[in-house]
């Protein structure tokens, strides 16, 4: 229930004294197989209710999924009084990007080429500007760092040296997000990689053979990783 969720998050924010951030995941409910549009609409409504709860003394909301009119003598105020904890969001479809641009604070991405990451950032920035907002960006990626590039590459190869591709495929397909657009894009990136699994210098995609979701790692020595992140 969004109102109870708002109170739970506010309580955690007080316990953590403002160090709390929230990652919004637009997943199916148990036993449900909703379209991405429906899941994003539900997320949109939940976020709007959270923001009302954290910034007002009442909740007055009517949408497709929720119809709430709640007055409270016990305001749901988080520790962070700038609108509540920062909201992180990841999604590659147009509705997902638009939701993030309108309501969230940080757009999260999975590994990709620098060119493609730049394209996503420009797209979301333009969408946010249309709402009079700015959005920050985050990247989830694994790191394999050793004293030398040779050692780092050897460590990467060791991770998958005993991987059975059939089992890896089964592991990926069992994940709840296995059929999402984001996971499909990770597979496309992996297919574009060279014989060693690098889609561009330092970006190694072979780790995605054994897991769903974030399917690549930065591989190199400390200076190389630092330079790539910059």
Identify the role of each PLM range.
Residues 36-83, 112-230:
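An alpha-helical appendage that flanks or caps ligand/catalytic pockets
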Residues 93-116:
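Long hydrophobic segments that form regular secondary structure
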Residues 7, 16, 20, 24-28, ...:
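Glycine-rich, histidine-containing beta strand-loop boundary motifs that form or position
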